[in-house]
């Protein structure tokens, strides 16, 4: 997905009379809709997976323009890793919410997770596969 990976935003709250409602902020909603659309295109006419799944997320983050040429080179060759925000767990939350009901029915189906966050051209790669069930004794 050609997006700059971002984390799941905090839930927002609005008061309407005596009621307080919770909603997702517009930037997070738009980001998740972009991922959801890409997931729908990738799935085609296939139904969502119903059993346990493995989720692989590869988030390539842009190098900040404020970095020197030396530091930018270090980021791109992998000697400096992306340890800034967004946190990798928040990236995963957005991905799982966007894929829910399209790729898999519910995010509780994810039983194996592998995520990587690096510097490079910004994009997000998502792979979901059915888990191979193993019998251990």
Task: List the model feature ranges, each with a label.
Residues 1-137:
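Acidic, proline/glycine-enriched N-terminal capping motif
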């Amino acid at each position: 997905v050609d997006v700059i990976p971002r984390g799941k935003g905090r839930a927002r709250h609005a008061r309407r009379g005596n009621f307080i409602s919770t909603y997702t902020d517009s930037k997070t909603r738009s980001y998740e809709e972009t991922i959801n659309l890409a997931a729908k295109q990738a799935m085609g006419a296939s139904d969502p997976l119903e059993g346990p799944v493995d989720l692989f997320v590869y988030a390539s983050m842009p190098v900040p323009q404020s970095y020197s040429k030396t530091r930018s080179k270090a980021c791109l060759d992998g000697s400096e890793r992306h340890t800034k925000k967004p946190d990798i767990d928040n990236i995963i939350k957005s991905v799982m919410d966007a894929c829910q009901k399209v790729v898999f029915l519910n995010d509780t189906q994810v039983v194996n997770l592998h995520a990587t966050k690096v510097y490079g051209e910004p994009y997000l790669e998502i792979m979901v596969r059915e888990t191979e069930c193993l019998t251990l004794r």
